[in-house]
Amino acid sequence: MNLRIVYLRSLNIQGLTKMTDDKNNLLHRGLDNIQPPFSNFIRAQATASVFLLVATITALWWANSDYSSTYQMLKHMQIGFFLGDIELQASLKHIINDGLMVIFFFFIGLEIKREVLAGDLAIAENRRMLILCALGGMICPAVIYSLFNWSLDSQIGWGIPMATDTAFALGALTLVRKHIPISLLAFLVGLAIVDDVGAIVVIALFYTQEISVIFLSISFSLIAFLAIANYAGVLRPIFYILIGIAAWWTMLKSGVHPTFAGVAIALTVPARPMLPPDELLSKVKAKITAMKKNKGHQLDALANREDHEQVLDVRDFAEHGSAPLRRWEDALDLPVSLFVLPLFALVNAGVEVSFSSLIETLQHSVGLGIVIGLVIGKFVGISGACWLGLRYKIGSLPEGINMQHVIGMSLIAGIGFTMSTFIATLGFDSQPEYLQSAKGSILFASLLSAILGLLYLRIIAAKKAPNSASKNGEN
């Protein structure tokens, strides 16, 4: 949590003076004035799902309206500039898919690193169960798709049903939040993060065509340089931004999809603050003591220059006392949720929707493999892996969660919209017929998974676990 925000929200002269009696008072007062971080995260994800839904509906309407030609023109509109003999331009769709989506994957990388260092993945027992469930939820859908497309040129799409859309899945779960334990939401977040790791590895290894060893070596060298700089204590954001852009560009030129660079660069972002907690509290306490001695007037950072500088000092202490990784993650949360992902949905979700096209999609091996992979494969893979993990004591479920909750969550995990669509655009970029079928089936499977999961959690799981549901409803 950003201590600067906590401090500024709770700042008043009476609250400051009390810190001299209790060195933790500032933190406690700030924490009391805001929602728990995970609740804020859930709310942000639910909001993101609304924006994604609006963008998706807009794309579907646009692509099926009388203005569909303008939709296609927008997607393929060339954007760029000329500088002498240098020409840099690309279609809007490629700019979003190869450029803006790197920011999304960078954000995912920050989440992964935080979870491994300080989240559920930092606890061995939780980590084992999450990884086991995620592997089941990736392998089973991929196998099902491959069975339907064995020896066909569409077999390359086996990675499409492996993914879960975190924003949409969490948004769906919040609709039945009163009937499920809050720990189920946290479990889904951890599961989705491991799922994202798997999807990123699949993209890097199996959805890359020709590779330039020279550019790839340069990119990895730059990323290694960032890792060394992190170890050496370099914390300047501009340093990581400039070197990171160079690493992204060279990876793009190498042939490996640049989203992999986004994740790799994120893993080099410093996770430790410049000021250790004890030193931070000591400096803040000393500054507040100095402010307390000035009893001639009320704190006025606008009218009084000295007060202004003292408040800025505390702000700087807070900046140095928070982890860059967490600050960057917080800073990117809204831009990614409200801008990057909706734009991606807008240019990629526009497919022809009709009863006849749906029937045609479900008769195609691509569509059938994706729908059954997401709806049935995710359910069987996640819940089956969880049952095996409990049966053989490989791991345990968080408190308040039972198998009925896991079954409902595994159905909702079949919502694979963003990442599944992204993998489809990579696998079927030169096969527009397959791509159209894949996009339509992803939408249908995601909608069906959401309906089945919500009905199960609302009707069956809630009845079998009334105590946990009622307790959660009181929170």
Swiss-Prot record:
Entry membrane topology: Multi-pass membrane protein
Database matches in InterPro entries: Na/H_antiporter_dom_sf, NhaA
Compartment(s) of residence: Cell inner membrane
GO cellular component, one term: plasma membrane
Keywords: Antiport, Cell inner membrane, Cell membrane, Ion transport, Membrane, Sodium, Sodium transport, Transmembrane, Transmembrane helix, Transport
Family membership noted in the UniProt record: Belongs to the NhaA Na(+)/H(+) (TC 2.A.33) antiporter family.
Function: Na(+)/H(+) antiporter that extrudes sodium in exchange for external protons.
Annotated protein name in UniProt: Na(+)/H(+) antiporter NhaA 2
Source organism of this protein record: Psychromonas ingrahamii (strain DSM 17664 / CCUG 51855 / 37)
